[in-house]
A protein has these predicted regions:
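"…together with the soluble PPM/PP2C metallo-phosphatase catalytic core" -> "…together
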Residues: 1-214, 218-257, 261
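Short, highly charged, low-complexity non-transmembrane loops/tails of multi-pass membrane proteins
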Residues: 261-284
Length: 284
């Protein structure tokens, strides 16, 4: 499977699943109010998780039948599967059980100091654990590299969530980040491994923009984690350190300022952010 084919298959699969899961997404337990007070399904990003599973299962079946030249489940594809399921599960728990009363690192730490463990804290703690497991596999260095790579993946996942404050924002940011990453990864094993997940994310852009569903943490965290994993698996130390610094800056900035306020003050960022959104939002 090529990178382009992986993107296309991921996008088509997630749309097929969205149509088939319409009744499930309409369940009262999944309905939440968005920033405009509209009620729509949250945790729509779980469709990305399911799409990756369907694509990988399909590749396995076709490979067993001798169709194509699939080498089997590579290490990179195994890592993507674990990342998607791990971060997807943690995000889903927060989507379904979180009350939104505590936000950001400081909010979760304040709640912990008060003797409360929030679902957001569980997601952050669990996400760090998933990231460590991802990089603590044969072929990875130990010590400093393990720490750098685990923090990079965890912060990338968290940034995906931090950006998910307006329709399409996380997916647009992911597309902007994915283009240079895809060029750097080329047609190698890592580029092919992350393509179905990214294709599935891009396949939900229209639904996110038109407010047919919300990605939720189950989707936003997964998108960020897959991009972070792509950097970790496919690039050298200089690229990883650069990405880590950028992620640290953005995660810290999110604790100090509102990304939405910054975007609204910068014309070109505002234009990108609102492109494709419903007219009511564009005129806001």
């Amino acid at each position: 499977m090529s990178v382009l084919l992986g993107l296309v298959v991921g996008a088509l699969t997630v749309q097929f699943l969205r149509l088939g899961a319409a009744d499930m997404l309409a369940a009262p337990a999944l309905q939440r109010e968005n920033y405009r007070g509209h009620r729509l399904p949250t945790a729509g990003g779980v469709l990305i998780v399911l799409a990756v599973l369907v694509v990988e299962a399909g590749r396995a079946v076709l490979g067993s039948l001798g169709v194509g030249h699939d080498p089997g489940l590579t290490l990179a594809r195994s890592e993507v599967l674990f990342a998607v399921f791990g971060f997807g599960l943690l995000g889903l728990v927060d989507d379904l059980l979180g009350d939104g009363s505590s936000r950001g690192f400081r909010g979760h730490l304040r709640a912990l100091a008060d003797g409360r463990i929030t679902t957001g804290f569980l997601k952050l703690f669990g996400g760090a654990g998933v990231a460590v497991v991802l990089v603590a596999t044969p072929g990875f260095a130990t010590g400093r590299r393990l720490l750098v790579d685990a923090v990079l993946i965890a912060l990338a996942a968290n940034l995906g969530n931090l950006l998910d404050r307006a329709p399409g924002r996380t997916i647009k940011a992911a597309a902007i980040a994915y283009v240079p990453l895809a060029l750097l990864l080329g047609t190698g094993a890592v580029g092919i491994a992350i393509a179905p997940a990214m294709g599935a994310a891009f396949g939900l852009l229209g639904d996110d923009l038109h407010e047919r569903l919300m990605l939720g943490d189950a989707g936003a965290n997964v998108i960020g984690a897959v991009l972070g994993l792509g950097v970790v698996l496919g690039r050298g130390e200089a690229t990883r350190i650069t990405a880590l610094v950028v992620l640290i800056v953005l995660n810290v900035a999110a604790e100090l300022v509102s990304f939405s306020a910054v975007i609204d003050r910068v014309p070109w960022l505002r234009a990108i952010d609102r492109f494709g959104q419903l007219p009511e939002r564009r005129g806001a």
